């Protein structure tokens, strides 16, 4: 299934797995006070994705183990806030891409309501309207001209749709 397409049109399953490990590495970099945009995504061998994920997750836990990091001000093109706010925005990305992988591989996870609620709350840092232009403006102001816009335009979904559906719709799925 590694070559199967995902709803994130520029990535197949293999590329998505590499991206998710890279996201964890960026989260760890932020926790250490390093530049998350200096992190490069390095694909793992096809039979080592689980090991790569576990190693990167341990780096995240180590980098964020001091609660003071949660209070530190941090800035990314899509959010300026505390470390906790930035973590929530990455939780949103990880949740959406987990949905992408589940969809691509025919799985239907039992979504954790608390996790999805936190991921949904994180989307409030950027408006659904005109956010691409805002993202590009902020990226340029931060000197990050090479950072790709991490979401597509929001798609309509009923207000009473399941939380995971509202989250992925906000991200253009």
Listing of model-derived features with the role each one plays in the protein:
Residues 14-32:
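Alpha-helical bundle segments that constitute or directly flank the non-heme di-iron/ferroxidase center
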């Amino acid at each position: 299934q590694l070559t199967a397409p995902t709803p994130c049109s520029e990535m197949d399953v293999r590329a998505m797995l590499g991206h998710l490990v890279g996201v964890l590495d960026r989260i760890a970099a932020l926790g250490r006070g390093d530049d998350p945009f200096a992190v490069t995504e390095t694909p793992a061998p096809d039979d080592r994705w689980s090991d790569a994920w576990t190693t990167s997750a341990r780096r995240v836990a180590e980098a964020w183990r001091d609660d003071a990091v949660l209070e530190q001000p941090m800035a990314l093109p899509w959010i300026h806030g505390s470390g906790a706010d930035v973590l929530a925005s990455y939780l949103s990305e990880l949740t959406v891409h987990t949905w992408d992988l589940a969809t691509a591989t025919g799985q239907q996870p039992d979504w954790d309501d608390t996790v999805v609620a936190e991921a949904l709350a994180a989307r409030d840092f950027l408006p659904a309207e005109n956010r691409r232009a805002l993202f590009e403006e902020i990226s340029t102001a931060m000197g990050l001209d090479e950072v790709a816009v991490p979401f597509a335009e929001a798609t309509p979904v009923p207000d009473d749709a399941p939380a995971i559906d509202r989250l992925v719709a906000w991200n253009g799925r």
